[in-house]
Amino acid sequence: MSEFVTVARPYAKAAFDFAVEHQSVERWQDMLAFAAEVTKNEQMAELLSGALAPETLAESFIAVCGEQLDENGQNLIRVMAENNRLNALPDVLEQFIHLRAASESTSEVEVTSATALSEEQLAKISAAMEKRLSRKVKLNCKIDKSVMAGVIIRAGDMVIDGSVRGRLERLADVLQS
């Protein structure tokens, strides 16, 4: 987890509450996603780590974002720049997404496998996780050859390791003890 999570949480909460109040959650998520990508730009990263005055930095950042930010999004950027927190934007986005998922009673579930899973396998995993978590789930699938076979499922703090690699690691631990 990033060092900015604690810093990002209040900004994400404020943005989320505002977005819900104004029925613009999707728009806010899009704005935050775009702004988070801008912070990853090499030239912008140099500006963010430089010694620019907060007002100058905010206006430069807003100029780069252009029409992607509405007036309220620009105000968030100004406040974050004033507090030297623009580097936390990717974490603000992440926290915003978590808040949205919680409000919509959905959970992000990461499924890592050695090969692409069939629709039937994904449906079974989705159904099992929905039952276990008592909420809707959104599967994010990744392929990692080092898993060898099986799957690793992550949902928040919960990890279900049904991979051959995981079994081999547990066997090695038992043999070493």
UniProtKB/Swiss-Prot annotation:
The keyword Cytoplasm does not apply. Its main location: membrane. The keyword Cell inner membrane applies. It comes from the Bacteria. It is a peripheral membrane protein. SUPFAM superfamilies: N-terminal domain of the delta subunit of the F1F0-ATP synthase. It is found in: Cell inner membrane. Pfam families: OSCP. GO terms for cellular component: plasma membrane; proton-transporting ATP synthase complex. InterPro entries: ATP_synth_OSCP/delta_N_sf (IPR026015), ATPase_OSCP/d_CS (IPR020781), ATPase_OSCP/dsu (IPR000711). Keywords: ATP synthesis, Cell inner membrane, Cell membrane, CF(1), Hydrogen ion transport, Ion transport, Membrane, Transport. NCBIfam families: ATP_synt_delta, PRK05758.2-2, PRK05758.2-5. F-type ATPases have 2 components, F(1) - the catalytic core - and F(0) - the membrane proton channel. F(1) has five subunits: alpha(3), beta(3), gamma(1), delta(1), epsilon(1). F(0) has three main subunits: a(1), b(2) and c(10-14). The alpha and beta chains form an alternating ring which encloses part of the gamma chain. F(1) is attached to F(0) by a central stalk formed by the gamma and epsilon chains, while a peripheral stalk is formed by the delta and b chains. Belongs to the ATPase delta chain family. F(1)F(0) ATP synthase produces ATP from ADP in the presence of a proton or sodium gradient. F-type ATPases consist of two structural domains, F(1) containing the extramembraneous catalytic core and F(0) containing the membrane proton channel, linked together by a central stalk and a peripheral stalk. During catalysis, ATP synthesis in the catalytic domain of F(1) is coupled via a rotary mechanism of the central stalk subunits to proton translocation. This protein is part of the stalk that links CF(0) to CF(1). It either transmits conformational changes from CF(0) to CF(1) or is implicated in proton conduction. This is ATP synthase subunit delta. It comes from Citrobacter koseri (strain ATCC BAA-895 / CDC 4225-83 / SGSC4696). The lineage of its organism: Bacteria, Pseudomonadati, Pseudomonadota, Gammaproteobacteria, Enterobacterales. The gene is atpH.
